[in-house]
Every structure is written in structure tokens, then in C-alpha cells.
């Protein structure tokens, strides 16, 4: 059983106090990470065998019949018909028991007991990895739930179902729902949790700037251990902020952040945050040869094997190389290509290729004098750039005002 699952055994409590947690931490997101690793072509076969064995033990322990069928389909494993039938029978028995409790509560007890039963059914579908039935049970549970805090917890559980299957439509739908409920009276603790949920979602859809702001807000008051460990929160915070923030903000919000530095200095469990610390320091301190080494190491050892970051690791790596080149070139009017290549610890041909690509797409404001082997940097006129930005933003604002006026006058 994973750590998240061990924490999820407590039953819902309903005494009219809506501050108590009523939804367990199912579905267990560690299981979906294991499923991702088993699908990854670069994971060693012996590692896959060990992970698959552990996953099957968890599936059997919790009678996860729907998830078992998904896993078998993923890895082309022959379905054990006897085991599947036994798990389905156990699932049906449990659902029948809960349904009977709900029916009895409707006849003989009150709304509180009915709500308890519906919550248990919803939680059970989450536990066994049955997305479709969890969504149906959510509707019934939500309609019977009257406390604002309780309703938000049910919505959080549906966001986790979306994260479990990386169903972005489902995640976005219920994050929007959670925000609407927060505006109606969500408490401080749940607002903090929502930041972590939304940050993880934004990172998974490549919105690193949006994720960075939310992760930074979540760091001092983090409590969403059903989503990730605190160590992973620090990893994601460093990864997104180095990509999204400029140097002054990176220094203020990350380099000087006590909570972040405490974790980075400690190195994390088994030293897993040491490369993250070296990555951040080498980038900020302009040790570009070390930065390239650390970026490549994180890419090959962490990003590729993280189900949220894996689809974006090439995009992230290109973006960070661009930021490093821009940071390097900023103080210069001209600089030799071979000097830049030496500072980055790569060949001149590599730097030449990279710069040509970025110049051609307008991402770097410079030109290459191939005859003399020199890069000529064209620094933007900040006033002219600001003037153009004001004109552009003013046009957008004017268009919106005109649209609003048409709506009001209609």
C-alpha cells in the first residue's frame, strides 16, 4: 500500500461541523505514476517487473477491477479471469452493501446518514479506479451535500480523479467548479489546497508561468500531500520559476525563500534535491557549463519519468537554453562565438546552430558575423518597446470596451 493510501483509511465524519475532512485521499496518484513508468520505453525491464508486481499486489489488495483491466490492456497482459471475476464480485458486494445502507437511511434515518452513504460509494469508486461510476456518484453526492466545505472536498476528489487519468477536460471543469465554490465561502485551508491542485494542472498543460505563481504561494502553507510530497513541490517550484521568472524575482521569491532553501540545503530524501539545488545555483550564478550538465541530468533522470513533465521536457529544455543564452548575451554588444561555446562547455558548431534557430524565430535580438566569428547583440530600446506595448494593450482594451458597450446598448 502506498503512503497516500495508508492515510486514506479514515471514514467520513458528519457532525454538522464542516471543517472536518470527509473525503479520503483516493484515488492514489502514486498508482498512476507507476502505470506511467510501466509504459515508459526507457525504464529498465527489471525495474518494470518489480513495479508491476507491486502494482498487482495493490490492485488485488483493494479489489481494483476497473483499474486492473486498464493495466492489462496497457501492457498486453493476459487477464486472469478468476482474479477479475473475484474482484468484480467483491466490488459489487461492497456497492450493494453501501446502496442498502443508503436506502435504509432514506427510509429510517436522516439526510446526514444518506449523505454518509453516498460519500462512501463515491469514495469506493475512486478507490477502485472506476472513473465513469465515480462521476455518476459525484453528482448524487454533491446534490446531497449541503456544507460548503464538504462540497469543496467532493470537488477536490473529482479533480484527483481527473489527475489520476490525466483527463484535462475533467480537471479543468472541476477546478473551475472549486473556484466558484471558494468565492461563495471557502475557508483558508481549502483555498491553499486549491492553489496546489491548480498549479499541478497548469504545469501539466505547459503553463509554467501560471504554475510558478501558484507553487510559490503554496510553498509556505502546503498541505496537499494527497497530490505530491513536499519534496516534489520544491522540485516543481524550482523548475517552473526558473523558466518563468526574471532574475530579480527569482532572487527574491526563490533564492531568498527560506522554505525553498531549507529543503534544497538539506538535499531531500536520499539526496534527490541536490541536483535541483545545483541546477538553480548554476543558472542564477551564470556557470553555464555546469548549468547545461545539470539541465541534461534533470531532463534524463527526472523530467522524462515524471508523468506531468514528460510531454514537455523538450519544450522546457529549449526554453531554458534560450533563457541562458539571453542571460549570457545581455551584458555584451559583441562577443566571440568560440568564447560563448567555451563558457557553455559545448562545441562552436552547436552554439552556431542554436543561435541561428533562435535568431530566425525572433527569440534572440542579435546577428552572427560568420566571417569574423562574432555575435553582434542588438539591445532593444526599452522606451520604444514600452511604447509599442502600451499601444498594443491600449488597442485590446479599446476593443473590449467597445464590445461591452454594444452588449449594454443591445
From Swiss-Prot:
The keyword Transcription does not apply. The keyword Cell division does not apply. It holds the Pfam family PCI. Expressed in multiple tissues including the intestine, pharynx and hypodermis. PROSITE patterns: PCI (PS50250). Acts as a regulatory subunit of the 26S proteasome which is involved in the ATP-dependent degradation of ubiquitinated proteins. This is 26S proteasome non-ATPase regulatory subunit 6. It comes from Caenorhabditis elegans. The lineage of its organism: Eukaryota, Metazoa, Ecdysozoa, Nematoda, Chromadorea.
Amino acid at each position: 500500500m502506498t503512503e497516500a493510501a495508508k492515510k486514506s483509511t479514515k471514514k467520513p465524519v458528519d457532525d454538522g461541523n464542516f471543517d472536518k475532512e470527509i473525503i479520503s485521499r483516493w484515488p492514489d496518484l502514486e498508482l498512476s505514476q507507476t502505470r506511467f513508468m510501466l509504459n515508459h520505453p526507457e525504464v529498465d525491464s527489471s525495474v518494470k517487473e518489480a513495479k508491476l508486481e507491486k502494482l498487482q499486489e495493490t490492485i488485488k489488495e483493494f479489489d481494483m477491477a476497473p483499474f486492473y483491466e486498464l493495466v492489462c490492456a496497457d501492457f498486453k497482459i493476459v487477464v486472469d479471469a478468476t482474479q477479475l471475476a473475484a474482484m468484480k464480485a467483491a466490488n459489487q458486494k461492497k456497492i450493494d452493501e453501501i446502496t442498502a445502507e443508503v436506502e435504509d437511511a432514506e427510509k429510517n434515518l436522516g439526510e446526514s446518514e444518506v449523505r454518509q452513504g453516498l460519500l462512501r460509494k463515491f469514495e469506493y469508486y475512486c478507490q477502485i479506479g472506476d472513473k465513469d461510476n465515480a462521476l455518476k456518484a459525484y453528482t448524487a453526492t454533491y446534490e446531497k451535500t449541503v456544507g460548503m466545505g464538504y462540497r469543496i472536498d467532493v470537488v477536490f476528489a473529482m479533480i484527483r480523479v481527473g489527475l489520476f487519468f490525466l483527463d484535462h477536460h475533467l480537471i479543468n471543469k472541476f477546478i473551475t467548479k472549486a473556484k466558484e465554490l471558494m468565492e461563495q465561502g471557502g475557508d483558508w485551508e481549502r483555498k491553499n489546497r486549491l492553489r496546489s491542485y491548480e498549479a499541478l494542472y497548469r504545469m501539466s498543460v505547459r503553463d509554467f508561468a501560471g504554475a510558478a505563481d501558484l507553487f510559490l504561494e503554496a510553498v509556505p502553507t502546503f498541505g496537499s500531500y494527497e497530490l505530491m510530497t513536499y519534496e516534489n513541490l520544491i522540485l516543481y517550484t524550482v523548475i517552473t520559476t526558473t523558466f518563468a521568472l526574471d532574475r530579480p524575482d527569482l532572487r527574491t521569491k526563490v533564492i531568498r525563500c527560506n522554505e525553498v532553501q531549507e529543503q534544497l540545503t538539506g538535499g531531500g530524501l536520499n539526496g534527490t534535491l541536490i541536483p535541483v539545488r545545483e541546477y538553480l545555483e548554476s543558472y542564477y550564478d551564470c556557470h553555464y557549463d555546469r548549468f547545461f550538465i545539470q539541465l541534461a541530468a534533470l531532463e534524463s533522470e527526472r523530467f522524462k519519468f515524471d508523468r506531468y513533465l514528460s510531454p514537455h521536457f523538450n519544450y522546457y529544455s529549449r526554453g531554458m537554453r534560450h533563457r541562458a543564452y539571453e542571460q549570457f548575451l545581455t551584458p555584451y554588444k559583441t562577443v566571440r562565438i568560440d568564447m560563448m561555446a567555451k563558457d557553455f562547455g559545448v562545441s562552436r558548431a552547436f552554439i552556431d546552430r542554436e543561435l541561428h534557430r533562435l535568431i530566425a524565430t525572433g527569440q534572440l535580438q542579435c546577428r552572427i558575423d560568420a566571417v569574423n566569428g562574432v555575435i553582434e547583440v542588438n539591445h532593444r530600446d526599452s522606451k520604444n518597446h514600452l511604447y509599442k506595448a502600451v499601444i498594443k494593450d491600449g488597442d485590446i482594451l479599446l476593443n473590449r470596451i467597445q464590445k461591452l458597450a454594444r452588449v449594454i446598448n443591445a
